[in-house]
Amino acid sequence: MKCLCCGKDIDKNGENGWHKSCIKRFFGASKLPEIEIDDETLKKLADETVNNGLTVPGVQKKLSLHLISENKSPKLTIVNFPTGYILKPQVPQYETLPEAEHLVMSMADITGISTVPHALIGNNGNYAYITKRADRITNTDRTAMLAMEDFCQLDLRLTQDKY
């Protein structure tokens, strides 16, 4: 079995498909955070996010998540701002889309292209793609947005032509 974060072999001591060291590096926690988002909640929240102009509409729904630790049990929760992670769950139209995105990002890592930290995480019996937000700088009184490019932009395609 391979770690869902780094892709290296993992033994039976791995937690839900992750090395303990990968959990610490990615989440800053000693335990893999809990996450439970059903399809109905996902659709509702993703639609709200698009309608509020917080993300671009597309095939792959995106949710902003924040990591909280209550009673030493970390959880990824759905919040507006500040957010620390982006979750992209499975979509019915394209099987294994989160796995494909993680694969492409891992290939970029191997070839020396700088990427944001990324991994797969279990969600309702499927995998979801999760990435750390690197496009925001948050301090005590405000959040600044940084310009970022994706592979669509690097190919000089417009966002509406992405899918």
Question: Language model features by range: what are they?
Answer:
Residues 1-41:
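Regulatory N- and C-terminal appendages and interdomain linkers associated
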Residues 32-33, 161-163:
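Short secondary-structure transition/capping segments
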Residues 42-162:
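Conserved ATP-binding subdomain of kinase catalytic cores across diverse folds
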